[in-house]
Structures are given as structure tokens and as C-alpha cells.
Design a protein with these regions (language model features):
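C-terminal ends of transmembrane helices
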Residues: 81-89, 114-117, 172-181, 223-231
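Helix-loop-helix hairpins and the membrane-proximal interhelical loops
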Residues: 1-48, 55-72, 76, 231
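Alpha-helical transmembrane segments and their membrane-interface exit regions
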Residues: 48-51, 74-81, 167-174, 217-229
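Membrane-embedded alpha-helical modules
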Residues: 125-214, 222, 226
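Short juxtamembrane and helix-loop transition motifs at transmembrane-helix boundaries
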Residues: 1-8, 29-37, 60-65, 91-95, ...
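Helix-loop-helix junctions within the multi-pass membrane cores of secondary transporters/permeases
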Residues: 70-162
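Alpha-helical transmembrane segments and their helix-entry boundary regions
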Residues: 39-42, 53, 68-69, 96-100, ...
Length: 231
């Protein structure tokens, strides 16, 4: 039985709770520099947790708009990889649907998508929209509320809330890793993880961190493909 929009919403609800906590943290951190309306516009148009945290830091440092745009672009380059992989399940979807799915795809909704792929080979367009939209609404709402509440705190940075996004990614990776153990060989996973870790560390000596993340991800994908081809 194919899953519909509301089943996509239900499947993504646990992740949406994570959006709320991280979004509140993002809003609180941004409160000294942005109004709730400005935060709402940022979340609607940018909609990228890591990029928004970076933008807030750059705003606090009075960085140029060009620098912010380039930083956001580099941070979000990884979305191209996720979108390319996800698009294989929606080849027959209309242009409007594919644009909608690609625009709202995040690390978290991609994680939910991968978890669903472990259960079924058929991912429907309505289910994917439900998966994406619940996070979008939760993120916008949480960041705006966080910005409004943050104005009541004397020093939001003292709470270390900017680490919340990292903590969420660790949780998502741990859950995804457990799922991969059911379908992938341990040797392959270890080879991929080792390739990503070593290449990322070495690349940091030559390129910026966002580029190192992207390049290490590509190297990890290449190693995974090679290992699968040999097995």
C-alpha cells in the first residue's frame, strides 16, 4: 500500500520535534541581531539550519552580504548530492513536484527518506511532500518563537545553544547508522567512514571547512560505490 501525504507527516513527526528544539535555539541565538519578522523571512527563504547559524555569526561580525551568500552556498552544496540521490525515486513526477521536493529537502528529511527506503522500494510524491513540509512549518515557527523569547534573555550565547544543531546531526547519524547495519556490510561502512574522516582531516589543510565537507562526502560516496562493486 502506497503511503499518502499524512503518513509522510506522521513519519517525520519525531524529526519535527528536533526541528522545534533546534529552531528555538537558533532563534534565541539570533535574537540580539534579528527581529522575529527578519528571522521569519530568513527561515522561509534560506531554510537551512547550519547555514542560518553561520549567517547569524556573520551578521554578528558585521560581515558583507557577499561573504554571507558565498558561505551559505558552500554550506548547502551538500544538498545537491542529497537531491540527486532522492530524484531517482521521482523521475515521473512533474517539474513543480520535483522543485517542491528539492527546495524543502534537508538533512533531516533526507534521513527520514533513507529510513523509509529501508522498508519499501516505493516512495510516493505525496509522502515526500508530507515529510518535507512538516519540518518546514516546524522550523519557521520555532525560529520565530525562539527569536521572540530570546529578547527576554540577557546573554543568549551563554547557554551554548549554537551546539544544538551538531547534537541533532549526531542523533540522526546514529539512527541512520543502525539502519545501515541491516543492509550494508560492516567492512564497507568502516571503509566509507574512514575515507570520509581521513580525507576531511587532510583537506582542511588546503581548503575551507565547507569545501572539505563536500569533497570528503564525495570521496566517501566513491569509496562506497567501489566497495559495493567489488562485493
Amino acid at each position: 500500500m502506497e503511503k499518502d501525504f499524512w503518513q509522510g507527516v506522521r513519519d517525520a513527526l519525531p524529526t519535527a520535534l528536533g526541528y522545534i528544539s533546534i529552531g528555538l535555539a537558533c532563534g534565541v541565538v539570533a535574537s540580539p541581531y534579528l527581529s522575529p519578522l527578519e528571522m521569519a523571512l530568513m527561515s522561509i527563504l534560506v531554510y537551512a539550519g547550519a547555514a542560518q547559524f553561520a549567517m547569524i555569526s556573520l551578521i554578528a561580525a558585521h560581515s558583507s552580504i557577499l561573504n554571507m551568500a558565498l558561505t551559505v552556498c558552500l554550506i548547502n552544496l551538500r544538498n545537491m548530492l542529497m537531491s540527486l540521490h532522492t530524484s531517482t525515486d521521482f523521475k515521473d513526477a512533474s517539474l513543480a513536484h520535483t522543485i517542491g521536493i528539492g527546495s524543502l529537502l534537508t538533512d533531516e528529511s533526507y534521513g527520514v527518506y533513507l529510513s523509509e527506503k529501508l522498508k519499501t522500494d516505493t516512495i510516493t510524491v505525496p509522502w515526500m511532500h508530507g515529510n518535507n513540509l512538516v519540518g518546514y512549518v516546524a522550523w519557521i515557527s520555532a525560529t520565530v518563537i525562539g527569536t521572540a523569547l530570546g529578547s527576554l534573555l540577557p546573554d543568549p550565547k551563554a547557554f551554548g545553544l549554537d551546539f544544538a544543531l551538531v547534537a541533532m546531526f549526531i542523533g540522526i547519524f546514529a539512527a541512520q547508522f543502525q539502519g545501515m547495519q541491516l543492509t550494508e556490510k560492516t567492512k564497507t561502512m568502516l571503509m566509507v567512514l574512514l575515507a570520509v574522516a581521513v580525507s576531511f582531516f587532510l583537506l582542511l589543510f588546503f581548503v575551507s571547512q565547507p569545501l572539505a565537507v563536500l569533497a570528503a562526502t564525495l570521496i566517501g560516496c566513491f569509496v562506497g560505490v567501489v566497495c559495493d562493486a567489488r562485493e
